[in-house]
Amino acid sequence: MFFERHSGGERTILVHLEGQDPEAREDPQEFQELAISAGAETVAFFNVPRHRPTAKFLIGSGKVEELRDLVKVEHIDLVIFNHILTPSQERNLERVFECRVIDRTGLILDIFAQRARTHEGKLQVELAQLDHMSTRLVRGWTHLERQGGGIGMRGPGETQLETDRRLLRVRLRQIKGRLEKVRSQREQSRRGRSRADIPTVSLVGYTNAGKSTLFNNVTKSEVYAADQLFATLDPTLRRLELDDLGPIVLADTVGFIRHLPHKLVEAFRSTLEESSNSDLLLHVIDAAEPDRMLQIEQVMVVLGEIGAQDLPILEVYNKLDLLEGVEPQIQRDADGKPQRVWLSARDGSGLELLEQAIAELLGSDLFVGTLRLPQRFARLRAQFFELGAVQKEEYDDEGVSLLAVRLPRIELNRLVSREGLQPMEFIEQHTLQ
């Protein structure tokens, strides 16, 4: 990793700002789970009433003094705030406590740094970390000078802070360039799957909802799965044959969480695009979680950030083995389409219902027909050919292209909407023979 992060086992105080809304009241438990996931040794948990935040410390001076005394008595190494701190607040608190202080964003970034396993995942975490820490350079990043390209780069009369900032900008450009190549490779892979008419189904959901366990059971894979937050960061794709549909590609991606740092969403955009470019999303929900409605809302917020909120979604209520009196089942909407599936990824009950629901949704969402494309839509015509969706082409007496196509309806809608039009404006009533 490009810069040092705190190691596990540090003696830690957790500071939570109490709010009035239900979401804030439920947050302390998740905050403690995050700290455990990071490897912190929690010595004390502080609930601070959230009245009027102060510009200097965020919390009142009385609480700051109380925390300072506890830090000294308990020999605390780290204080973590379950709230976003400004760089100046972080520095002011560190001066008073004489120990390290990080906020919720820094904590989540640290967990991601520990969980990343692939080269791409590590680059994405590093990008988010550096972006977050760029506003905190006043701490004195003299260690940046030791990184690749540091020696010999300092200009005459340049301060250490200026050098650190310049080195940071260079490193950020390097990482973004590498991730752009990864993004391009992923796009090529997606185009290849689309040309082969293989739909992509992505697992999304709140962290620790059981996505990777479900993925492993369905695909007979051995992706890392554990009862911990953010066990999976790196996307995994597997080809799967469904009896009533044929081949699909199933993708397992990073889990979401409340107040997921925007920097992480941006850094992991190439990974999250596996979801936003899918034909169907499986929203995995922990059915045994009392707070699941808030978790569902947060997942929808992140899907909105990556442009995936309008994709077809099948809700998958997992962990049925932890509930009593609930059987595996498919629940349908008023039109009879599968809306949610209840199952247990751990013991495998209900998996056949999930496959049935996927086959129903994807099979009914294929468009097979003829499109009428005048010459001014040559670019749109080329895109259908690029996707491998064209089965036959003819021209009418006016030189208008008649394309017999077969592709997911959502893909048709996506391509046509880019032209500011509706699919019905192109659909020919008479199919080609």
Predicted regions and their residues:
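C-terminal-of-GTPase-core extension/linker across diverse P-loop GTPases
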Residues: 1-14, 135-209, 215-216, 290, ...
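Short alpha-helix plus adjacent loop in nuclease-associated cores
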Residues: 106-128
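Conserved C-terminal guanine-recognition region of P-loop GTPase G domains, centered on the G4
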Residues: 26-36, 41, 64, 68-73, ...
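N-terminal accessory targeting/assembly segments
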Residues: 1-109, 424, 428-433
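Flexible beta-alpha connector loops of hexameric P-loop NTPases
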Residues: 18-23, 53-57, 115-120, 159-160, ...
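Switch I (effector-binding) loop of TRAFAC-class P-loop GTPase G-domains
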Residues: 3, 186, 193-199, 217-248, ...
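Conserved nucleotide-binding/hydrolysis micro-motifs of P-loop NTPases
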Residues: 18-22, 50-52, 84-87, 106-109, ...
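Conserved beta-strand segments of the P-loop GTPase G domain that flank and frequently precede/overlap
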Residues: 14-18, 45-48, 80-82, 283-286, ...
